[in-house]
Amino acid sequence: MKIINFIWKTRHDAYKVGKYWRHIPDCKTREACHVCQAEESMDHILTECSATGQKLIWELAETMWDERGLPWVWPSLGLILGNNLADFRSPCNTALTGANQFFTILISEFTYLIWKLRCEWRIEHGGNPDKIPEPEKIRRLWFQTLSRRLKLDCLMTNRSRYGSRAIQTSLVDKTWWIVLQNRSNLPSDWPKGGISGVLVGSGSACPPGRNR
């Protein structure tokens, strides 16, 4: 829900960033990024700035996406705001449901991670260049973010608990199977029985027949 709210507010220009501060007395210094000296717009924060890990976060997402064998689209603000419109297709023009869902997850989850890191750096640390998060921290949070989403999707397959809000086991399988460790040894109903982990930046080849 937090991610949905963030995307909605960003679409409606509801955040106080960049030029919002331009004509407010004593706040003009907030308009510019403390590191890049460019306007601290949402576009700059999510796709351009070097201060709070956005480049590394998107590079890690690209590495994970490579597991699907599909072209990566480097995020722009427009793509981020329309991330739920992903439409990857097979050579036969069949919608790749799992790939589209996974792309949406990568873009939405990591957009929000970038925003959280930015808020921490700007609000808690006053934009201090010495407090820019280290790559090790970013990688750790990246893995935690994706692992948490995977676990949530698996839990959401429980129809007795979530009813009409439950996610189909087949969709979870199509979305996540290709980035799981030891995937060739997993049972067909693995979302209901636990998972073995996530391949972060793995270069392992995809077993045939499951690029969905």
Where are these regions (language model features)?
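Family-specific functional microsites
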Residues: 1-212
